[in-house]
From Swiss-Prot:
Pfam families: ATP-grasp_2 (PF08442), Ligase_CoA (PF00549). ATP binds at K46, G53, R54, G55, E99, C102, E107. Keywords: ATP-binding, Ligase, Magnesium, Metal-binding, Nucleotide-binding, Tricarboxylic acid cycle. The gene is sucC. This is Succinate--CoA ligase [ADP-forming] subunit beta. Pathway: Carbohydrate metabolism; tricarboxylic acid cycle; succinate from succinyl-CoA (ligase route): step 1/1. Succinyl-CoA synthetase functions in the citric acid cycle (TCA), coupling the hydrolysis of succinyl-CoA to the synthesis of either ATP or GTP and thus represents the only step of substrate-level phosphorylation in the TCA. The beta subunit provides nucleotide specificity of the enzyme and binds the substrate succinate, while the binding sites for coenzyme A and phosphate are found in the alpha subunit. One of its GO terms (biological process) is tricarboxylic acid cycle. The keyword Magnesium applies. It comes from Rickettsia prowazekii (strain Madrid E). Substrate binds at N264, G321, I322, M323. It comes from the Bacteria.
Length: 386
């Protein structure tokens, strides 16, 4: 789960990370009075969307008077902001964050992530802050600093000293950096985050370190322990089909293709998407019904797939282990009766109760195209939509 910048800063401040401060606006009629509450010479107006690249897209602007700030804020509120992460459709700006501006002497990058490939927590830092860190890693990899933390032993003093030293901090700034490292680590662990990113972390005109922008991503599986964080969820920033799927206990991610996929198991789902592309088409979604899906969940999964108007065909690929193939078959028939399936439907079943599942489907009035293996299924659905 992602949250907005102003929410991330609120959490980090609770752990002792110094951040820039401001006020959030969620209604246009509140813009003027909110700006009037800020006593500053420079205003920074920031669009609050769950996407990077806001600055280059016009989602972060500076104003040097109250009147200018009010005009900028009114112009920004409600627009569709298009960045390199939103796609061409953009993201509507329903919230803006208005901060007091400050002088910036130097910008840094600092983050903590869960590195699955190394099975450890990793700090990533760079003296090249305020820019896309992926671009820095590609063009100047020597500027990227990494410190791995063993989860068994946790954060140690040498991690904090090492990060401060590699970033070139000395004396009081080194002390500040060590405190920030410790605070960010504690926030990461205690909130079940998967990433905390501060970009940029700056030195202001007083020589102090300050988090000017912040991003936090949380592990959805840990949210049940953090109702205060769950309450920060902004459903307007999420795909409505993905939200609907999550409420039904399904793992669904919308994609750009036109072949809907319903699969059990994340690995099999990815393999299914790969082979669809191999045969010359693109998947419309990732959808994992899970190992314990019942008839109702299967029916809801098909309804969600068909809610995407771009879907021209559906491939159901089930390997019955815990999941029984006859349950899948019953769910398909129930969905067809409820909403009607008017696009080509290819079904590949294998595993528990497979013969019973095939019998249920063959005895139905549905025009189902059976497939005996994954390659056959991909070939048939691609041919069917052409």
């Amino acid at each position: 789960m992602n949250i907005h910048e102003y929410q991330a800063k609120e959490i980090l401040r609770k752990y002792g990370v110094p951040t820039s401060t401001g006020l959030v606006v969620t209604k246009t009629e509140k813009i003027n009075e909110t700006i009037d509450k800020l006593n500053t010479k420079v205003y920074v107006i920031k669009a609050q969307i769950h996407a990077g690249g806001r600055g280059k897209a016009g989602g972060v602007k500076v104003a040097k008077s109250k009147e200018e700030a009010k005009k900028v804020a009114h112009d920004m509120f409600g627009i569709n902001l298009v960045t390199h992460q939103t796609g061409p459709q953009g993201q509507k700006v329903n919230r803006i964050y208005i901060e007091s501006g400050c002088d910036i002497l130097k910008e840094y990058y600092f983050s903590i992530v869960f590195d699955r490939s190394a099975s450890c927590i990793t700090f990533i830092a760079s003296t090249e802050g305020g820019v896309d860190i992926e671009a820095v890693a590609e063009k100047m990899p020597e500027k990227i600093i990494k410190f791995a933390v063993d989860p068994a032993t946790g954060l140690q003093d040498f991690h904090m000293r090492g990060i401060a030293y590699e970033l070139g901090f000395k004396d009081n700034q080194a002390k500040q950096m060590k405190e920030i490292v410790k605070a960010v680590y504690n926030a990461f662990i205690e909130t079940d985050a998967t990433q905390i990113e501060i970009n940029p972390l700056i030195i202001n005109s007083y020589g102090n370190l300050l988090a000017l922008d912040a991003k936090i991503t949380f592990d959805d599986n840990g949210l049940f322990k953090h109702p205060n964080i769950t309450a920060m969820r902004d459903h307007d920033e999420e795909d409505p089909l993905e939200t609907r799927a999550a409420n039904a206990g399904l793992s669904y991610v919308k994609m750009d293709g036109n072949i809907g996929c319903m699969v059990n198991g994340a690995g099999l789902a990815m393999a299914t998407m790969d082979i669809i592309k191999l045969y010359g088409a693109l998947p419309a979604n990732f959808l994992d019904v899970g190992g314990g899906a019942d008839r109702e969940r299967v029916k809801e999964a098909l309804k969600i797939i068909l809610s995407d108007k771009e879907v021209k065909g559906i491939l159901v690929n089930i390997f019955g282990g815990i999941m029984r193939c006859d349950i899948i078959a019953e769910g398909i028939i129930a969905a067809a009766k409820d909403i009607g399936i008017k696009v080509p439907l290819v079904v590949r079943l294998a595993g528990t109760n497979v013969e019973k599942g095939k019998e249920i489907l063959s005895n139905s009035d549905l025009k189902i195209i059976p497939a005996h293996d994954l390659a056959d299924a991909a070939n048939k659905i691609v041919e069917a939509i052409r």
